[in-house]
Regions:
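Conserved class I S-adenosyl-L-methionine
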Residues: 100-110, 306
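Conserved SAM-binding strand-loop segment of SAM-dependent methyltransferases
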Residues: 140-152, 348-349
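Short, glycine-/aromatic-enriched active-site segment of Class I SAM-dependent methyltransferases
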Residues: 193-215, 219-221
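A short glycine-rich, Lys/Arg-flanked "PGG" loop and its adjoining helix->strand segment in the class I
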Residues: 175-190
Length: 403
């Protein structure tokens, strides 16, 4: 496989009626944190909109080996995610005919944190993930395969529950993904697929557009995709994690679709199935980038140091598009610390680095992992007590908050 391939049909409804929505220029891979002098390759980063089902997808899909074999994102570093994982296990127990010893497969199990909570609840835990650097962590207490998920790699075992959290959108062939899931489901099995940024368009968010995220689903596009398989989309829930996420419930048997129908009507009322909504979204994205640059310039002139918090992939997209250089970025993930950000070459430091600033230094904090804003703010305030510090937020519009 070459480094990337063109996606010329809608991945959900298979239509060729797709048009460019946003072009974020060529950018390096968002999670390619590197040593200071390393030169990175850039790849096309743009999204098309399907004019039939309103699915948003990348124009090009990068070879997954370049993205996931050595993966520096770990899910167990934030309390917000851990709390959501605990909630999710309880949700699954209540939503299924759970009995102790039920089997669960976590597709893209990362460092195994979600599986840890399933194991605590009495599930037999299985995982699969291609990240070779995380295998020792994920396989410590669980049955884990270090590979990509497909019907060949997972074998013939059938599972009671299958979980795909924030991995389904990474796949450039989601229909094949669903077909592979069907082969390892029995009649009562439940597949839960979580996709992030359910309110991306309504809140003018664009920073989650990076090469790992091939697709940006709405309820209609997911429904059209599932209809092309032997499975059934039976319910949809919205959860607050990752800036509001969809949690899709998919089964072999067709059951009540009331929740699904309600969400379809809700999104239609919001304008998500109207081309005018996406024209406005495009204009708002441009305005946010220009306003962000203006705010940054004003604070630099006023003598503020510019400190990002959370070297999240979404932040890399934002900074590269805005072409803004910060003084440093703080991140609590040890795997990223002392490396440099892709494209902007900003050094990543641990939280303790903040103590090197004097008490009367003025800092402008930009929480790049804005989906963990409250947690980030709390960590900063525990480290610094300076009333002149300011927090900059940029969705759904650019604005500041005082300490």
């Amino acid at each position: 496989m070459s480094d990337y391939k063109l996606l010329d049909r809608c991945l959900c409804c298979d239509s060729k009626n797709i048009d460019m929505l946003l072009n974020l220029n060529e950018q390096p891979l968002a999670n390619s944190y590197h040593e200071e002098d390393e030169v990175l390759k850039s790849y096309p980063l743009a999204v098309n909109l399907c004019n039939e089902c309103y699915h948003i997808q990348l124009t090009h899909a990068v070879n997954p080996d370049l993205l996931f074999k050595d993966y520096l994102y770990v899910s167990g570093t934030t309390q917000t995610l851990k709390d959501n994982m605990k909630w999710f296990v309880e949700y699954v127990q209540k939503d299924t005919s759970y009995t102790k010893g039920n089997s669960v497969l976590d597709i893209a199990c990362n460092d195994g944190t979600q599986l840890d909570y399933f194991k605590e609840a009495g599930f037999d835990t299985y995982g699969i993930d291609p990240a070779e650097n995380l295998y020792e962590l994920s396989s410590k207490n669980h049955n884990v395969i270090c590979d990509y998920f497909n019907s060949d790699t997972i074998g013939n075992k059938v599972f009671d529950v299958i979980v795909a959290q924030n991995v389904f959108a990474h796949n450039s062939n989601p229909k094949d993904f669903l077909d592979s899931c069907e082969k390892i489901m029995h009649d009562e099995s439940v597949l839960y697929i979580q996709t992030s940024q359910a309110e991306m368009v309504m809140n003018n968010q664009f920073d989650t557009i990076y090469h790992e995220h091939v697709s940006f689903f709405n309820v209609n596009s997911m429904n059209q995709l599932v209809k092309r398989t032997n499975l059934n989309l039976v319910d949809v829930t919205k959860t607050p994690v990752h800036g509001t996420s969809y949690l899709f419930k998919i089964t072999k048997n067709k059951i009540s679709e009331l929740g699904l129908l309600n969400h379809l009507e809700e999104e239609k009322a919001q304008g998500l199935y109207d081309e005018k909504t996406y024209e406005l979204y495009k204009k708002n994205v441009i305005n946010i980038v220009y306003n962000f640059r203006d705010f940054i310039d004003k604070f630099k002139i006023a003598g503020y140091s510019l400190v990002g918090y959370g070297a999240a992939a979404k932040g890399m997209t934002f900074l590269n598009l805005a072409d803004v250089k910060l003084d440093c970025i703080i991140d609590d993930n040890e795997l990223k610390q002392h490396l440099y950000t892709p494209g902007t070459n900003i050094v990543i430091k641990p939280n303790g680095f903040l103590k090197q600033y004097k008490e009367d230094d003025k800092l402008l904090f930009i929480p790049l992992a804005w989906n963990f804003y409250n947690e980030i703010r709390e960590r900063i305030l525990k480290t610094r007590d300076n009333k002149n510090d300011v927090f900059l937020k940029y969705f759904p519009k650019v604005r500041t908050e005082s300490r």
